[in-house]
């Protein structure tokens, strides 16, 4: 059934299946004061989710519990708890193989434990959405924000977006399904935020009407057939390619891995349309630019305000999506800059490395300041880096 055929009809909760463009662009919005976790719940209330699978790990546990309330209220089709993060992501794959719209959440060590499944999701072309509320993963453990796990996710074949605010989070959850479920894309989405900074602080978020929801997922638009889970048509693990011919194995895997990354590239035009671009810029003619993603953008904004009070002009480039990577946009935005400051919430500086690999005259990139393990980033240290 085409999604357009249900537009205007109602689900069992009385919500109207609404054209996503009307719902997100034209429908009236209500300002609401919510934590990021509550915002996740409100987005899922309107997302026509078939299956949510949960396993608790801070800072996403609250969101997973709140979505359980939505199941009790009848807003999502099914909800159950996994035995571990690895089990959750495997079960998500099973539900998506069966043609369900699937949602889950994880963070930090949970992301690491689940990691094997993410390339499998991408390779199987499963448009699952996973919220990643980034936190420390090193020993000694920390439950505080750290974005190192994003660097791993960027190599899985998934789409990877990085939200700055709760408003980003709300809009991008709903828009994310519209991009990832496009037949020429059909890839999983890791929608990341900086844990606690976004999940546990309150902010004003403009919400779409509660009586509107996304049209349901249509698995028949998938570029690969959904699987009959009662009578699967193939034996998934017996007689693998390599048992028959190394050449067949190489050809199969090489071509399909290239197709997965090509699908991520094909998401670019859809993502640009929904997110109003892969980057957001302010005053890019300035000699000094702050270029980063997530809540480091928010700290950069405050640093820019402090510097403006001293008569120092600094521009900003907010990177919204990491996969697809906005290569041409970053080159264009930074072409006039003499110094490019890249503040990050991780120890390895993966964002600075990506930017250095993207732009000409990479010596302009100043990798830092960086904080890690859950430390805050006072805007004053960005100011000090720029003055230095």
Which residues are covered by each model-predicted region?
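Glycine-/acidic-rich phosphate or pyrophosphate-binding loops and their flanking alpha/beta elements
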Residues: 35-40, 265-288, 301, 305
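Conformationally flexible catalytic loops at phosphate/diphosphate-handling active centers
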Residues: 8, 188-280
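Thiamine diphosphate
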Residues: 58-149, 154, 158-182
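N-terminal glycine-rich anion-binding loops that anchor highly charged ligand groups
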Residues: 32-69
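Peripheral docking tails and interdomain loops at the edges
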Residues: 13-14, 343-388
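Generic long, charged, amphipathic alpha-helical segments
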Residues: 300-333
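Structural signature of the thiamine diphosphate
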Residues: 160-224, 339, 345, 381-388
